[in-house]
Structure formats: structure tokens, C-alpha cells
Amino acid sequence: MKNVTDSFVSLGRWPSAGSFGLNTDILATNPINLSVVLGVLIFFGKGVLNDLLDNRKQRILNTIRNSEELRGGAIEQLEKARARLRKVKTEAARFRVNQYSEAEREKLNLINLTYKSLEDFENYKNDSIRFEQQRAIHQVRQRVFQQALRGALETLNSCLNKELHLRTISANIRLFRSMKELTN
């Protein structure tokens, strides 16, 4: 024990600066000094090191616990997302079938509507043709009637003399008088 104490005492007596020497005494060298320093450090630092390690252990355990909770939440969300995906796929398939059926219905409705529009257009065309024919027939009749009237007037004017003209007027006047008497 005396050597250990001597080694500590010798620490107080360092050689002066600028000199360097090699100490070959095993008891006075570094391995013993180091073991003492390490012993003191272990004895006094054990509590601090245990506290540090316990804190680190708690943080690691908390991190693991949080990770497990997050993992559980993520698995739960994944299952919910998968269920929603299945539901959406089912609805999409049903929607696709309904849309196909509705598209076919719309196509048939459009075909029927187009056919009806074509029928209406054909009827309108036929009505327009009939109207134009009636108008043309009416115009022809008016022209024929006007020409007949002109011809009759020309014939009457060429055949009528004053005497015939006066007799016609007198006959018409008598006719009107008799009509007037009948109405009174």
C-alpha cells in the first residue's frame, strides 16, 4: 500500500518542465495510476452512469411503445383503408354497370328521339309541300278566275250596247226591289 501512496505522492513532484524521462518502475507507472483513477471513476460515476443509462433505457422504451402504438394505429388505418377500397371497388363496379345500362338507355332514347324528330321533320316537310301546293292551286284558280272575268267583261263590253245595258240595269234594280220587299 505504501507504493500506491508513494505513487500518489510522487504525482505532486513532477520533474521540471522541459525534461522528459522514461520511468521503468512498474509500480510507479501508468497502469496502476490508471486503475486507481478508473476505480474512483467507476465508484463515483456508477450512479451517474446508471442514471444516464436508465434515462436512455426509458427513452428507448417510450420510443418503442410509441412506435408500437403508431404501428397499431397504422395497421388499423390500413384495414379501414382496405375496407373503404373494397367498398369503393364494389360501388365502382355497380356504378360502371349502372352507367353502362344508363348509357344504353340514353342511346335508345336518343335513337327514338332522333327517329321522332325525323318523323316530325318529314311531317313538317309534307305539310309544307301540301301548303305550297294548296297555295299554288289557289293562285292558279285566282288567275283563271281573273282571266275568265276579264274575258267575260271583254265579251260583255263588246256585245253590250246601250239598250242592252239599260235593260240589264233595270232588271237588276227590279230584282233588288223584290228582294227588299221580301225582307220587309
Curated annotation (Swiss-Prot):
Its main location: plastid. Keywords: ATP synthesis, CF(0), Chloroplast, Hydrogen ion transport, Ion transport, Membrane, Plastid, Thylakoid, Transmembrane, Transmembrane helix, Transport. It is a single-pass membrane protein. It is found in: Plastid, Chloroplast thylakoid membrane. One of its GO terms (molecular function) is proton-transporting ATP synthase activity, rotational mechanism. In plastids the F-type ATPase is also known as CF(1)CF(0). HAMAP family: ATP_synth_b_bprime. This is ATP synthase subunit b, chloroplastic. It comes from Pelargonium hortorum.
